Amino acid sequence: MKSVRYLIGLFAFIACYYLLPISTRLLWQPDETRYAEISREMLASGDWIVPHLLGLRYFEKPIAGYWINSIGQWLFGANNFGVRAGVIFATLLTAALVTWFTLRLWRDKRLALLATVIYLSLFIVYAIGTYAVLDPFITFWLVAGMCSFWLAMQAQTWKGKSAGFLLLGITCGMGVMTKGFLALAVPVLSVLPWVATQKRWKDLFIYGWLAVISCVLTVLPWGLAIAQREPDFWHYFFWVEHIQRFALDDAQHRAPFWYYLPVVIAGSLPWLGLLPGALYAGWKNRKHSATVYLLSWTIMPLLFFSVAKGKLPTYILSCFAPLAMLMAHYALLAAKNNPLALRINGWINIAFGVTGIIATFVVSPWGPMNTPVWQTFESYKVFCAWSIFSLWAFFGWYTLTNVEKTWPFAALCPLGLALLVGFSIPDRVMEGKHPQFFVEMTQESLQPSRYILTDSVGVAAGLAWSLQRDDIIMYRQTGELKYGLNYPDAKGRFVSGDEFANWLNQHRQEGIITLVLSVDRDEDINSLAIPPADVIDRQERLVLIQYRPK
């Protein structure tokens, strides 16, 4: 009976965090709008080999993540939930692997359930796991690889070992097809310390080639298909998206070595109090095979991405699955022997909630700021933000009432965030970061437009997805579409600032021409170097400028 209650509680937890509130949040640009539009175009065109964005070749990532996103929109429709359905599914599958692997290592159902809840409630997991990017997919394949390698090395027969390594190769192959060759580097680096400490080199060398073969066979059909269709895909993807992005001096998203330290700290909420003890206990018990394996899968990817020049918070998402298992194991030991870490965790959550309440007041219309984040007419959004932090502090306090028994309720600290964050986003943020909001405000003007031009790829993708059209033209800036725009058949999909006046004269009689520009808050739109317009509609950071036939 207790097991049934636990299962009902887990399903209610998943529903409140990962299902019910998702549709209340508009899509963010540039990431969510980009991936939403790529998948929409895949469904509309029926081309499941070559990814396109705004009708242009888009070679920044392989195909598998787009497949899953497309299936999500096919099943649930072109809506906010449909766009995010794929990443939510991947996150829940990863949580299922956490459950299974914890049960496999310790044979403890309660520990497995706690590891799952800790994983799903970690701030970084929830933030990225409900956000339409490709990282939850690669995380699933990496965690699946972690489980597969363990199965292979623990098998007692050659058939079991062979099956485990073949499965490992499939997960690596799907990882390559999701986000590239990092899906090969991370597993290799993660298992080496364990193999070295356990002296299991023989098994690795005897059976490892099976993983290589199954990985190649997994990638080969699509790899050959896209090479035939687009011969320069692999050159661009390997050199630009891997070497330049991560290793060279001009790498994207350059950041210092210590960049991930604050990411790990913030991402570990509401379980931050368990982080030091979990890592220390893992190191202290490094003679235990399972513990050192989890520790290696936590630390090695973190070090690898810290050394790389290009960094983003999403890159280290896979580290938190083994970390959640270490945290759960440590928490149960602490609850029995010394609950100090659990008390510290409760106080951290109280402090975070109270700090958030104070910060919300400071940036509210009633605070001391001359330019508040929320305006007076957005009072309900301020109260939603207060509720988010109040619930965080409340559940932090509740875990202290009987800490040996109530500490798991820290998982409910982000409940307010899950339910209310979509209602608390300030209008000034929505107007710049949520193209759907802009489309709602300007729908009547946008819909009849013969041509739509914009200077932002993220906004262009949002307009294309909302209006169900892929012919948005880039104006002044090419951004990440630069490579696709270089193809001969992309001629006419970019208009420079100097060419716009002539282009306008040539096309004005064909129908309404709409220009959507991103501007600074204090920028005078009358100073823009464009011909006089018939309509100007400013929505804070986005401006609609329209030219009608004459």
From Swiss-Prot:
Entry keyword Lipid biosynthesis: yes
Protein localization: Cell inner membrane
Pathway membership: Lipopolysaccharide metabolism; 4-amino-4-deoxy-beta-L-arabinose-lipid A biosynthesis
The entry's keywords: Cell inner membrane, Cell membrane, Glycosyltransferase, Lipid A biosynthesis, Lipid biosynthesis, Lipid metabolism, Lipopolysaccharide biosynthesis, Membrane, Transferase, Transmembrane, Transmembrane helix
Primary residence: membrane
Record-level GO BP terms: lipid A biosynthetic process; lipopolysaccharide biosynthetic process; protein O-linked glycosylation; response to iron(III) ion
NCBIfam families: PRK13279.1
Function description: Catalyzes the transfer of the L-Ara4N moiety of the glycolipid undecaprenyl phosphate-alpha-L-Ara4N to lipid A. The modified arabinose is attached to lipid A and is required for resistance to polymyxin and cationic antimicrobial peptides.
Protein name: Undecaprenyl phosphate-alpha-4-amino-4-deoxy-L-arabinose arabinosyl transferase
Organism of this sequence: Escherichia coli O81 (strain ED1a)
